[in-house]
Regions:
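Single conserved hydrophobic/aromatic residue that forms the stacking wall/gate
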Residues: 1-8, 12-13
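C-terminal non-catalytic interaction/assembly regions of soluble proteins
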Residues: 18-142
Length: 142
């Protein structure tokens, strides 16, 4: 199962859109994000939390164990992405300058949608959900 979202001028805004894809994609499925990231990765703490963690699961467990009054600024952003990465492969289609940042943040880079679909092994037996403007979508499971 593959879900795709198109949102955001920076990586941290894409977390918000990715939650729509997360809700529509079964565990083990692939989420493809398409965005230029013209403003880079967003907050430095967001980037470093993912870059420096051993794994998304380790980061998520550590953040969940952090008392509410001790959370890092904007911790929620990296916490959401870590949660998503624990259950989904995430491929980010963006400009070439973002490849290292994307890979540092435990995601896979693709230069275009065709390459992302190939990396996701999308075939006739898979389903594809496209969520335009994912940041403003509410998924209702029925």
């Amino acid at each position: 199962e593959i879900s795709a979202c198109l949102v955001g001028s920076e990586m941290c805004i894409r977390d918000r859109g990715m939650t729509a894809a997360e809700a529509s994609c079964r565990s083990g499925g692939t989420i493809i994000m398409c965005a230029e990231c013209a403003d880079g990765h967003g907050g430095e703490g967001f980037y470093k939390a993912l870059r420096d963690c051993k794994s998304p699961a380790e980061l998520y467990a550590r953040q969940m164990a952090t008392p509410q009054d001790k959370t890092a600024p904007d911790q929620w952003e990296s916490q959401i992405l870590a949660r998503i990465l624990m259950h989904h492969k995430v491929i980010v289609v963006s400009r070439p300058e973002m490849q290292k940042t994307i890979e540092d943040m435990k995601m896979q880079y693709a230069p275009n949608l065709d390459a992302a679909l190939k990396a996701a092994r999308y075939g006739s037996s898979k389903t594809l959900t496209v969520i335009p403007n994912g940041i403003s979508v509410i998924i209702v499971n029925q």
